[in-house]
Amino acid sequence: MSSTKNLSRREFIGVSSMAGIGLALSGTPLLAQSSVVQTGALATSKKFKMGIIGCGNRSRSIIGALNSVPEIEMTAFCDLVPNKAQARAAECIKNGAKPRFFTDMNEMLKMSELDCVAVITPSDTHKDIVIAALNADKHVFCEKPMALTVADCNEMIGVNLRSGKALQFGTQRRHSPEYKAFIEALHTRPVGKILQSSLFDFRGDWRVPAPDEFPAGTPYWRLDQKRSGGVVFEMGAHIIDVNNWVFDSEPISVCSLQGVNNFTLRKRDSSDHAGVVVEYANGAMMNYGGNVYNYGSQALDTFFGTNATLQMGGGKLSIKYGFPPGFPKPKDLPQAEVISLTGNNREGDGVVEELHYFAQVMDGKQKAYPDGYIARQSVQIMEGANRSAQERRVIDVKELG
């Protein structure tokens, strides 16, 4: 673990290359975290056999997307609950795939014909399943968050580097046409340096699972802080990753207040609301807020630059330019603009694109993106936020390992 916890991103990519993961460093889009990856740039004619581990609600999205990814064949489904995998396959498979079914992950991993697995299980299980799959010589696509602690992330990165297999994480906004258009606008408009962000995830409470959805006697994991990480992990994983993408800098300190305060919801010890402030090495600051009792509309994500304010939401990006009072108005001050970010992507959120890209990674034509380093950055913030709330102090990210 100690050999991986302090790897810089450039070092991580270099070691990954030596381990046989993807292309050499030169010319890859990952040298700058803020780059926009072109998902369809290098098509593959190969077909990779995938096993699905975890057939819960999130698997609907992944399986549905795989119907549109001919490079990946759904070969095996695994879930602890008997017949749950069969039911999910019958519901979601539309491309004629006929997978085998398992209740024991280790038995599925023995399939020699299996090239890769998708890990779509509760957050606290990711580390052990990912490591088992890598040790079984499988490429791994793992849903977010990477894990619940930085220590677990470091262990996963170490096994990944030794395995020589690909490990990619499912923060799909990095592959979403909408978010890539946002990043492209950020780079091509004269907005200046991004100094601060104000981001929110306000939503309703989690759905009520069916009585037979989990093994008998197993409580709903999303209501358990130790298993889910609470509202910051459950909802922050997406937008915090986007913020890291925009800031293109390392988080260095985290402060948070959070807890359970809406007792009209189901009984839980997982936080139902949170406020988080993060300082980055480049001086930028993120403000994040989330809750699971919103019955109104979502707030806009706002980024404040030295020359402009950007607000994103509802498929649109608005940019308003300005200058400080007391200074002459710049002659070339651009007009405010509203940019449509909604393209013709029928899935909408980047899931199909990230799976196409994962096939290219397995074919050696791309590097995993997001990789373990990128995914770990979000965990640094989220674990730091939870510890800050528990210990009532600012957390230095270096404390987390």
Feature map (PLM): residue ranges:
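Beta-strand-loop-alpha-helix segment that lines the small-molecule cofactor/substrate pocket
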Residues: 116, 122-123, 127-175
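N-terminal secretory signal peptides and thylakoid transit peptides that target proteins
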Residues: 2-20
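C-terminal glycine/acidic-rich active-site capping loop/insertion
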Residues: 211-216, 242-245, 253, 266-271, ...
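Glycine-rich phosphate/pyrophosphate-binding beta-alpha loops
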Residues: 237, 263, 289-297
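C-terminal helix-rich "cap/oligomerization" subdomain common to oxidoreductases
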Residues: 14-44, 118, 359-401
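N-terminal Rossmann-like dinucleotide-binding module
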Residues: 18-95, 176
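A structured beta-alpha segment of the ubiquitous adenosine-cofactor-binding alpha/beta core
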Residues: 100-114
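Predominantly a Rossmann-like dinucleotide-binding segment in NAD(P)-dependent oxidoreductases
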Residues: 54, 162-168, 173-267, 276, ...
